[in-house]
């Protein structure tokens, strides 16, 4: 299966770019960058994707499409959207794709 990497295509936060570079260095092979804010609408071939970093501007864009096979490491839920993000659909998705590696105790 091909690999995807989460990218943040419309941000000026250098930390988002650094996290993307770290994953690219880790996987060290061919990959496609997928926009963090539109993972739900990905409709290309299935890909394994490391899900890491800060989630997200629009909680309605989660969970990712069924063509994304996630591995959650260093995952963080933005506290400002947690009440909208952690709906029954998202919680079911996270349970289905356990374990979820989180980067902080809040998440």
Regions found by a protein language model. Give the residues of each.
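Aromatic- and Gly/Pro-rich donor/ligand-binding loops
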Residues: 1-107
């Amino acid at each position: 299966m091909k690999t995807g990497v989460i990218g943040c295509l419309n941000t000026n936060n250098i930390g988002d770019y650094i996290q993307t570079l770290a994953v690219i260095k880790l996987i060290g092979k061919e990959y496609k960058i997928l926009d963090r804010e539109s993972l739900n609408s990905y409709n290309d071939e299935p890909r394994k994707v490391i899900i890491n970093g800060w989630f997200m501007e629009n909680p309605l864009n989660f969970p990712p499409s069924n063509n994304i096979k996630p591995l959650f490491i260093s995952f963080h839920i933005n506290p400002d959207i947690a009440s909208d993000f952690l709906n029954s659909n998202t919680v079911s998705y996270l349970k289905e794709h356990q374990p979820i590696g989180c980067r902080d105790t809040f998440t």
